[in-house]
Amino acid sequence: MPRTYDEECSYIERITDVVYRIKKGFVPNMNVEGRFYVNTALEKLMFEELRNACRLDGIGGFLPAVRQIGNVAALPAIVNASIGLPDIHSGYGFAIGNIAAFDVSDPDAVVSPGGVGFDINCGVRLIRTNLSEKDVQPVKEQLAQSLFDHIPVGVGSKGIIPIGAQQFEECLEMGMDWTLREGYSWAEDKEHCEEYGRMLQADAAKVSPRAKKRGLPQLGTLGAGNHYGEVQVIDEIYDEYAASRMGIDRLGQVCIMIHCGSRGLGHQVATDSLVVMEKAMKRDNIIVNDRQLACARINSMEGQDYLKGMAAAANFAWVNRSCMTFCARQAFAKVFNTSPDDLDMHVIYDVSHNIAKIEEHLINGRPKQLCVHRKGSTRAFPPHHPLIPVDYQLTGQPVLIGGTMGTCSYVLTGTEQGMNETFATTCHGAGRALSRAKSRRNIDFQEVLNKMQAMGISIRVASPKLVMEEAPESYKNVTDVVNTCHEAGISKKSVKLRPIAVIKG
């Protein structure tokens, strides 16, 4: 007999103003507790989703995010807690915005493609300029068009980077070292990139021919969905020192944000691995609450193959963002009739939102190697962490939070408390509140475009019909999400940006 909504809620208790705990027993076989971060506005959405699920009694595609946090807590060798961030919403296997870490030294520890997501290393890059809003306003339409012309966008968009099959293998294994060699990146771009733009364990041989076939023509393309390129201006500075380390020194300063991932290649790597892992689960007798949580032991051949293929897809995404940076620099140079160098178009940082990595964390005061799954969440290392660039040693790692189309974005920095509480992880964006299908039914695309224009935002869209899926009404309020993380102490607000021009797939 399924439990009622009130019975479900008896397993969930508030710890602080912004943190809830999910007690063991909420779903079967939980090895650790669950925990999620929400403020009052976001809490309503979380519990509403659970209430609807109790009413429907499991009819429909996705489980509510709270239950997904519980199911992840039942995975073998999970450490501390299964954690949900304020932008959490239901996804495949893991909710998007769910983090989990597994002890690599435990022979039962697993890696799960559902804990990374289909768009491997979907992420965000922020580039600064020395321009001010007043420099851009007179040529804003021209600039939006120039970016749209330079960056291939849309569902079936083909790349403009000439590349053969042999070079493609190199690009999968070398990541940004490849774009540096080919002249698409500046040497210092790599310094300001998570993993320095290259995961060393990548092995192109672990990426199927079908995945390569899908990825090859898409190099340097934006794709559709929630991916975008935005020209933004600095709207507020909360932490002047951190902002100055990032090269942000005034309100109205112009930046470019690029949000994209590994396109069809990453999707295929995930799909291929799920098939293989189902077999490995039968062989190793791994039992999970939800078959979407297909996984393999980290130290098994299947687990290692997935991590190597995932790393190659992650490298592809960094190459992708680097090629788009190259295109954006060209677009700006053309409109302002000067060089990208003279426009000071340096990368502030580049972060990944969907990835699994082996990292060292303190568990009960002892350093442990953990496989941290971050799906729809961002690494946020604290000040003095050895893996962040020299420029940010005193501020903590920059964390880039993209808003939704036409809403503000944020730059945060990592904190020591986040290191201790959430495996140095914080939110990644607004998080969906309406499914894509609901958005298409309820929102008119022309209305969305008109609203953007009324806000003074120039927009270029390859597939206007997809715009309503990404309308601000489809998402949670990004300010609520960021403020919840700030209040919880797992990241700290530095800068707020607002868009003045958007290009979308």
Swiss-Prot record:
InterPro entries: RtcB (IPR001233), RtcB-like_sf (IPR036025), RtcB_euk (IPR027513). Binds 2 manganese ions per subunit. GO terms for biological process: germ cell development; IRE1-mediated unfolded protein response; tRNA splicing, via endonucleolytic cleavage and ligation; vulval development. Its cofactor is Mn(2+). Coiled coil: none annotated. It catalyses: a 3'-end 3'-phospho-ribonucleotide-RNA + a 5'-end dephospho-ribonucleoside-RNA + GTP = a ribonucleotidyl-ribonucleotide-RNA + GMP + diphosphate; a 3'-end 2',3'-cyclophospho-ribonucleotide-RNA + a 5'-end dephospho-ribonucleoside-RNA + GTP + H2O = a ribonucleotidyl-ribonucleotide-RNA + GMP + diphosphate + H(+). The active site is at 428 (gmp-histidine intermediate). GMP binds at residues 226-230, 353-354, 402-405, 409, 428-431, 504. GO terms for cellular component: cytoplasm; nucleus; tRNA-splicing ligase complex. Mn(2+) 1 binds at residues 119, 122, 227. One of its GO terms (molecular function) is GTP binding. It comes from the Eukaryota. The keyword Repressor does not apply. Pfam families: RtcB (PF01139). Keywords: GTP-binding, Ligase, Manganese, Metal-binding, Nucleotide-binding, tRNA processing. Mn(2+) 2 binds at residues 122, 259, 353. Its EC number is 6.5.1.8. Transmembrane segments: none annotated. Ligation probably proceeds through 3 nucleotidyl transfer steps, with 2',3'-cyclic phosphate termini being hydrolyzed to 3'-P termini in a step that precedes 3'-P activation with GMP. In the first nucleotidyl transfer step, RTCB reacts with GTP to form a covalent RTCB-histidine-GMP intermediate with release of PPi; in the second step, the GMP moiety is transferred to the RNA 3'-P; in the third step, the 5'-OH from the opposite RNA strand attacks the activated 3'-P to form a 3',5'-phosphodiester bond and release GMP. Catalytic subunit of the tRNA-splicing ligase complex that acts by directly joining spliced tRNA halves to mature-sized tRNAs by incorporating the precursor-derived splice junction phosphate into the mature tRNA as a canonical 3',5'-phosphodiester. May act as an RNA ligase with broad substrate specificity, and may function toward other RNAs. Belongs to the RtcB family. Catalytic component of the tRNA-splicing ligase complex. This is RNA-splicing ligase RtcB homolog.
